């Protein structure tokens, strides 16, 4: 109620704009009886000509996802990689991730972050990442915005934030001496 939303310089009501956005949620919402290959076939029907089946297959291979294994047999990290492959296969300009690395083991989290870093190397791509894991933000963010109860408290360049603020770990006695 306090403003407007623009995505890629247009309103989110524009179907052409929505087609340029990939979304990854904390949990993958695919039928567990499906296989990654079946997910790709379903999404091809949704995205139409924008869907790149060859790229999706390449992503499955890159992410070491077995195309014929049912989703219920995949680990949480593998499900997240399937979710990411599904979001990337129509080659979006903007990738929106909501707690995409939450609950993953360190190895899976690192692999997801590497994939995101590869994605943003192309300056035509952007990532909007919602996360409570500050180390993830340190690794891939250029700008960090802090929202609290729906209010934007700040949006600053990550390097400026790192220079301006820090964490002091000490006892109360040491703090009192400062």
Regions found by a protein language model. Give the residues of each.
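Conserved beta-strand-loop-alpha-helix hinge in the C-terminal portion
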Residues: 151-177
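ABC transporter nucleotide-binding domains
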Residues: 1-128, 132-135, 139-148, 154
């Amino acid at each position: 109620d306090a403003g407007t939303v623009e995505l890629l310089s247009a309103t989110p009501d524009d179907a052409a704009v929505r087609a340029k956005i990939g979304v990854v949620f904390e949990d993958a919402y695919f039928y567990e009886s499906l296989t990654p290959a079946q997910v790709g076939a379903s999404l091809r029907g949704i995205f139409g000509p924008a869907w790149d089946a060859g790229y999706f297959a390449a992503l499955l291979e890159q992410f070491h996802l077995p195309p014929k294994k049912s989703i219920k047999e995949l680990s949480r990290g593998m499900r997240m990689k399937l979710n990411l492959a599904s979001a990337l296969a129509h080659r979006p300009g903007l990738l929106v991730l909501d707690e995409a690395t939450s609950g993953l083991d360190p190895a899976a989290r690192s692999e997801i972050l590497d994939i995101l870093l590869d994605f943003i190397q192309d300056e035509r791509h952007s990532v909007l990442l919602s996360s409570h894991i500050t180390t993830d933000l340190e690794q891939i963010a250029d700008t960090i915005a802090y929202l609290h109860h729906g209010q934007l408290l700040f949006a600053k360049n990550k390097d400026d934030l790192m220079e301006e603020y820090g964490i002091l770990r000490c006892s109360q006695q040491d703090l009192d001496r400062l």
